Amino acid sequence: EDNDLTKPVWKFLKENKFFAMIIPVAYGGLGFSPSAQSKVVTKIASAGHIGLAVTVMVPNSLGPGELLMHYGTQPQRDKYLPKLSSGEMIPCFGLTGLYNGSDATTLIDSAKTDGDEFVVTLNKRYITLAPIADLIGLAIKVDGKITLFLVERDHEGLEIGERHNPMGQPFMNGTIKGTIRLTKDHILGGEEQLGKGWQMLVECLSVGRAISLPALGTAAAMVSAVASGSYARTRKQFGMSIGKMEGVQEPLAEIAYQAYVNMNTQHLINGELQAGESPSALSAMWKYQSTERGRIAVNHAMDVMAGAAIQEGPNNILANTYKSMPIAITVEGANILSRSLVTFGGGLMRSHPHLRNLVDAIQDEKTGSFLKHLGLMIGHTVSNFGKALTRNRYALFAFTSNMVLTLGAKYKRSEYISSRMADIFSIRVMCSGIEALNQDDMRDYTLKRLHNEELQAYKDVEKELPLVAGLLVKLVRKVNFMRRIHISPEDNATASRYITEKSFFVNQMLTKIHVSGRLSELVECYINNRHEQTVQEVDSK
């Protein structure tokens, strides 16, 4: 009625420390690994409770808890982390404003110095958990640089505004406004962190962005696969299971493909995070890939389940997830931004072995250093050209990246190229995990599909490069990709059977998702090979 979680649910979440998964045990938290956090959010999201999943994921992603652990002063940690762990305080973080969304650098919420105090005028919106938050992190510009502040809800002049209504999902989201006075003690991390807020945000966002929303996207894909596969096996039309119809097998194969990619890449990325990696390009890539693939899977599952998918009610498995996917696509870095700017456009400068040094040498007007790193850059290009001729696709990506740099400063504005290079990078990462799996038909089908996606991305890039660079990329691309692999109806039928018939793949998904109610009934029919039991009989229960 209030579009909110019930009081017993809130009580359960606080008592069982769902908001403290990332907080160390020493401060009363659970100290969970990235993999454990991912599994918890996946399980919740797979039940279709997207509002609950978002409520749990936000305090464990970018917010006061994560920032306090990395940058907070010892008094700040001692004061707030135990209260966040116990649920006594609910956190939120205010970054988005009226004129800044994906581009946080356009932030207009600013502070004026008044003696030893800061007079802050703020107008934040779209802030998850703001309506109920007790501890609020704020991104504010001080002397043109972003600084992070911590304030409590009852701070004089702070106004928690009305709630937003994000796609009708029951999670708290709203505005933060007001004119308030703050001291240096309110700076997260103390005075030494004044003006360093942007760096703090980028470093902390990398980990949470690779866990929370990808868990939601992966859950969406896996539930879509299990539900549509079980339904297609059970549902009969024209005297046969619809899963045996060629027209239905095509979307079923698409669903199986997206779920297979998401499930296996999630395992790979969580392993990287567990090893201490937190690269922003990798997290941006995985966020946009996992949520986009989850959306594709849900859309196709809605088509397969047809009337059963569009009638809302407690037995509808997909509707809530379907309606909420735009939330996953949008928050923590909109997918368009993540794909076209952040992954390759931002990642190339950070990851290239010579580019940063070359740019620094130009800016500092150091001729000797410039010539040295230019030589290294040329050597890097020639070396990867040679390796690419031996069908090394990682070398092909590195060589093509250097060819993109022939565009000069224009490469960062060439978002068409940048987005396709991001896709290629994504596919290389995903293939590195999938190629290591035991060989079976689903693995082979998935690699064929990824092969075709990668081939098309290279074709798009080479056409937009300067003439010589484009021809060189086309040459080594043809060595690596002789042709597009045809996906036949028989291939689709084989892939679809991985979710309509008993398989190790489905068994894996069943261990990762929540199975109850209507989905439980469908899975029971699937497991027991009960073709004769129609979906209408399941509905009647």
Q: Which role fits each region the language model picked out?
A:
Residues 259-289, 301-310, 408, 429-473:
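C-terminal helix-coil-helix/basic helical segment that borders enzyme active sites and/or dimer interfaces
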Residues 15-78, 82, 86, 127-132, ...:
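Internal helix-loop-helix
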Residues 157, 176-209, 226-243, 265-267, ...:
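A glycine-rich, basic-preceded beta-loop-alpha segment at the flavin cofactor/substrate interface
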Residues 132-135, 159-179, 184:
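Catalytic nucleotidyl-transfer cores of nucleotide-processing enzymes
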Residues 117, 121-161:
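A short core secondary-structure module
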Residues 393-394, 414-431:
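C-terminal substrate/ligand-recognition segments
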Residues 4-11, 15, 72-82, 87, ...:
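Gly/Pro-rich turn-and-neighbor structural signature
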Residues 309-390, 471-540:
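Glycine-rich phosphate/cofactor-binding loops in nucleotide/flavin-utilizing enzymes
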